Amino acid sequence: MGKHTKFGSSDDEGETETSVAKRQKDEKKEKKKEKRDRSRSPHKERERSPKRDRHPEKNESRRHDDRDQERRRDYGRNDRRDDRRGDGSWKTDRNDRNDRRNDFQRRDDKNRLSAEEIAAQRKALWGNKKVAGESSSSNTTDTASSSSEPATGGKNEKLWSSAIAATGVDSSKANKFMRLMGVKNAPKPTDDSSRLSDEKNRQDKMLNDLEKQYAIARETTHMGRGTGFGFGH
């Protein structure tokens, strides 16, 4: 072996590279930790480049308002302009908006009719349509004709009166129902026993037919399931 022979030189070099990498990693961690602490500390703020202030007389809130106003676009809609004052600023006062004014409801009621006008219109629509200048003879003939009309009545009026009489409803409810159906001069229900029995039999027959038809339809729907004819799955 020579004079300058060294044993284990490869091991020493390997340990040196490992220690250097570890030291660099630790230094990187320290720098990262220091940077994080500096950003959190209120006393050590990062220096920022100064910005040129074009409007030194405006404060920060005024700049924000101007920036927001530049972003908006007014397309000529009146409902947007109503919320602004003459100088262009938004209405923030309590009484500036239309729906917060004291006379807002009164302005809305301008086109509404008064109670007297509504009563006059109802009277003209539902009241007696006789002419005021008619003679007494014409009045007597009108009353006679009006008294004869309920006795005869139209086809629908007779049908309703017989149906109501067959159900056994009292006269006040029958008159109210006839008025709701649009029959102004409803004829009085007849007390003929034969007509009442015929009407009752007709109603019973109609109810029985409806029950039979419902049973047939239900059975058809139940038995037709799965056939593909629209009765279900």
Swiss-Prot record:
Sequence ranges of Low complexity compositional bias: 135-148
Pfam families: SMAP
Compositionally biased residues, Basic and acidic residues: 36-115, 189-206
Annotated segments matching region Disordered: 1-159, 181-206
InterPro entries, alphabetized: SMAP_dom
Protein name listed in UniProt: Uncharacterized protein ZC262.2
Upper taxonomic lineage: Eukaryota, Metazoa, Ecdysozoa, Nematoda, Chromadorea
